[in-house]
């Protein structure tokens, strides 16, 4: 008997579990009628609280507080108002607390929804999409085949790209020089640029093929011999060496070399300008000239400060540590210019003394020449007589 009851109970439980598992997850079960009655009663009370505070559902927290302050000044027992009533104030206070908590919960729920929406949007933006075709990350995605084959193709690609860039730079340079003032010719040249380039390429190719057919390339001195691609150092990358050779042949110089030349020319110009300013003031310096010299020195120091900043930039890009430069000292440069000016003044004084001695010697020789000439005339007259 007991076994039969247990078996029936097991079957009933199994049936209920099976039915529960068959319910789709999106379908919500109906709630208990008692819970629905409780929620309806709470909503009615909440509407009554809103009515007591003279507010609409969906108002903000600030509106709730402002309405409570107005009603408190009106119904508080200690306010001294004609409408003061402690029972009404207790109801208003209870309504205020419930409405305020409801408004805060609604505000937090809205913020949570906004944050969830923003997070979903960000996840959608940064969601990884599987590429349709795989791309190589090395060698700029150029080439196909094995890694060694792709490396060779990439070297050829870089060499071709460098050659094209150099040719484009030379063409633009010549175009700026010869067609700088002719807008019409420049526009026409740009419109026919592609056609002219293709025509030149075809012409060069035809000339090469014609020369090969004639046998002009058969008796070359380097035929059948390996090309001299390297400068004798086997540790240099051949691709880098060839690119540098192409750039050097076309007059290109690295940025650090140009900056080094700029620094050298700038310091020479500053020294010459400072020396010329010192020569203009003369020697010795008057009080006015001393003020002028002080202003010149201040300007020189400011220019040296800018030049030292340029040296910092140069030291950051120079590839060789021994090529780096130290800062120039403005005071040492000023002392050096003053020493050069002192040597210049001494040289001028020596030159003036030599010129004075020479002029005095010529003046002393002139009377002797005149006396000798007169004696010779008198002798000639006596001979004639």
UniProtKB/Swiss-Prot annotation:
It comes from the Eukaryota. Residues 48-132 form the J domain. SMART domains: DnaJ. InterPro entries: DnaJ_C_subfamily_28, DnaJ_domain, DnaJ_homolog_subfam-C_membr-28, J_dom_sf. The keyword Coiled coil applies. Keywords: Chaperone, Coiled coil. The keyword Mitochondrion does not apply. It holds the Pfam family DJC28_CD. Residues 261-318 form a coiled coil. May have a role in protein folding or as a chaperone. This is DnaJ homolog subfamily C member 28. It comes from Mus musculus.
């Amino acid at each position: 008997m007991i076994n039969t009851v247990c078996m029936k109970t097991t079957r009933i439980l199994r049936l209920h579990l099976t039915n529960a598992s068959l319910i789709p997850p999106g379908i919500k079960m109906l709630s208990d009628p008692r819970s629905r009655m409780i929620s309806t009663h709470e909503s009615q009370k909440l509407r009554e609280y809103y009515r007591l505070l003279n507010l609409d559902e969906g108002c903000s927290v600030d509106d709730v507080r402002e309405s409570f302050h107005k009603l408190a000044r009106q119904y508080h027992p200690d306010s001294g108002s004609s409408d003061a009533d402690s029972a009404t104030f207790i109801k208003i206070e209870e309504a205020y607390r419930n409405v305020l908590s409801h408004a805060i919960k609604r505000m937090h729920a809205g913020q949570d929804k906004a944050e969830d929406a923003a997070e979903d949007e960000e996840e959608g933006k940064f969601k990884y999409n599987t590429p349709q075709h795989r791309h190589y990350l090395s060698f700029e995605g150029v080439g196909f085949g094995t890694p060694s084959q792709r490396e060779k193709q990439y070297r050829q690609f870089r060499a071709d790209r460098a050659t094209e860039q150099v040719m484009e730079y030379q063409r633009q340079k010549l175009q700026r020089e010869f067609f700088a003032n002719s807008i019409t010719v420049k526009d026409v040249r740009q419109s026919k640029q592609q056609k002219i380039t293709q025509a030149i390429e075809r012409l060069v190719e035809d000339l090469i093929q014609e020369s090969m057919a004639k046998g002009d390339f058969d008796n070359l001195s380097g035929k059948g011999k390996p090309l001299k691609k390297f400068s004798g150092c086997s540790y240099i990358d051949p691709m880098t060496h060839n690119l540098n050779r192409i750039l050097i042949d076309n007059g290109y110089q690295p940025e650090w070399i140009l900056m080094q030349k700029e620094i050298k020319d700038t310091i020479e110009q500053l020294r010459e300008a400072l020396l010329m300013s010192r020569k203009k003031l003369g020697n010795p310096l008057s009080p006015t000239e001393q003020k002028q010299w002080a202003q010149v020195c201040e300007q020189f120091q400011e220019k040296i400060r800018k030049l030292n900043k340029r040296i910092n930039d140069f030291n950051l890009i120079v590839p060789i540590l021994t090529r780096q430069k130290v800062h120039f000292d403005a005071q040492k440069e000023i002392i050096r210019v003053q020493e050069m000016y002192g040597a210049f003044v001494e040289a001028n004084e020596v030159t003036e003394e030599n010129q004075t001695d020479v002029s005095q010697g010529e003046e002393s020789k002139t009377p002797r020449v005149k006396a000798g000439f007169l004696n010779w005339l008198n002798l000639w007259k006596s001979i004639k007589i």
